[in-house]
Amino acid sequence: MFLLLRCSVTYPKLLQIEDNTKCFATYFYTIYLAISSEMLKFAAIFENIMADSAKTEQQFKDVLTECRTLFQKKLHDYGASWRILRPSSLTDQLYIKAKRIRSLEIKKESLVGEGIRPEFIALINYGIVGIIQLEKGYVDEVDTSDEALQLYDKYALEALQLMTRKNHDYDEAWRSMRVSSYTDFILTKIQRVKEIEDIQGDTLVSEGIDANYMD
């Protein structure tokens, strides 16, 4: 409808032409040009969206690769010693990491030389470890590093797939968020997990601990 109105405003004299055939031919040709122009604009926008989505998915993969590389190196050094940890202990570790990020954001300096980025990587890895512990349970004897890495890959892939689906639905709105907002959001999630743990998982409407770890 807005195309018809625009054409009528642009070419008001068309309605006064005696040759009706020429009038309508010119009129609808104008509409055709207008629609074609809009379709080209839409195609360009759609192409940009697809390109951005592909770029975002690759960025997700690059970050997970970086996290996995560090996780694998620590498996070499320490083994899968984290398999001994109960989920509540992992929640506390996540809390400490997130609190340190917020502290650094506020103070604008670190006295121990480690910045915010390593802590975000640690949050990702501990989150995956938490999901593993929820599913497999904690143990007294650690698993082999190969088995631990297989479990890591399984849940890292699930997290990637969830992020991709959410990115589709939210149309990359997260890119407009401040990093400090992510920190607060993560702390909120961790606090929810602590509350759920305190009531032994007996929730009424809330998502479980695993969903919060995945987020």
Regions found by a protein language model. Name each.
Residues 10:
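Zn2+-dependent cytidine deaminase-like catalytic core
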Residues 13-14, 23, 29-48:
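Short, positively charged and aromatic/hydrophobic N-terminal segments
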Residues 42-215:
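Intrinsically disordered, low-complexity regulatory regions
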